[in-house]
């Protein structure tokens, strides 16, 4: 018996590849959430969600960077991406574990993930304003994970879709991968946005 089998006796050699497949699958299914914020920046502009209002602390509720156009555009972009990612499997291998589900399910599930990511980002902006941090200021941890928490939380509105993909069995390994890879991916995407002139800060 290989040494690692003594450490992980419940994982058979045949099951190990299946468990490892959960990592790229979780990242695959989470792509709509990953793309929501960058697309919100691309489609952003126009009236801010908070309509320019401030709270009693004198700080804006969210700030000018959070707009209705960005919220709608980012959500739709993520929904369309999920639909496009799923179409090849729907046509060639409907029962594939990589499929988002039938077209309607793929669109709705991806929209929920994307909207959750953007709502999580809104909560992050709200917290930063309460901390008197200006728009674009760094808030380690909050900046990297607000959208992840928001997307995963809202995805529980459709548990039949989200639980087997993120919250049970081997999918938990994929969830861990999302948590680990997010800071580096977040940094890379923001750097690209900065180079393209879409963001004022490279973080």
Go through the PLM ranges and name each one.
Residues 158-164:
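Transmembrane helix-loop junctions at the membrane interface of multipass transporters and ion channels
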Residues 2-154, 165-203:
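Interhelical loop and helix-boundary elements at the membrane-water interface
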């Amino acid at each position: 018996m290989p040494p690692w089998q003594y450490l992980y006796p419940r994982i058979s050699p045949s099951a190990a590849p299946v468990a490892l497949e959960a990592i790229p699958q979780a990242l695959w299914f989470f792509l709509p959430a990953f793309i929501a914020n960058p697309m919100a920046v691309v489609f952003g502009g126009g009236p801010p969600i908070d309509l320019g209002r401030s709270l009693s602390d004198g700080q804006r509720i969210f700030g000018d960077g959070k707009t209705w156009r960005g919220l709608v555009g980012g959500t739709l972009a993520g929904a369309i991406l999920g639909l496009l990612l799923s179409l090849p499997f729907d046509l060639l291998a409907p029962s594939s574990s990589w499929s988002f589900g039938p077209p309607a399910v793929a669109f709705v599930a991806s929209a929920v993930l994307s909207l959750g990511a953007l709502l999580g980002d809104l909560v992050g902006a709200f917290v930063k304003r309460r901390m008197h941090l200006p728009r674009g200021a760094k808030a380690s941890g909050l900046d990297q994970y607000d959208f992840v928490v928001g997307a995963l939380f809202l995805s529980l509105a459709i548990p039949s879709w989200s639980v087997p993909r993120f919250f049970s069995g081997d999918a938990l390994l994929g969830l861990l991968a999302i948590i680990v890879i997010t800071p580096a991916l977040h940094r890379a995407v923001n750097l690209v946005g900065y180079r393209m002139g879409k963001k004022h800060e490279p973080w």
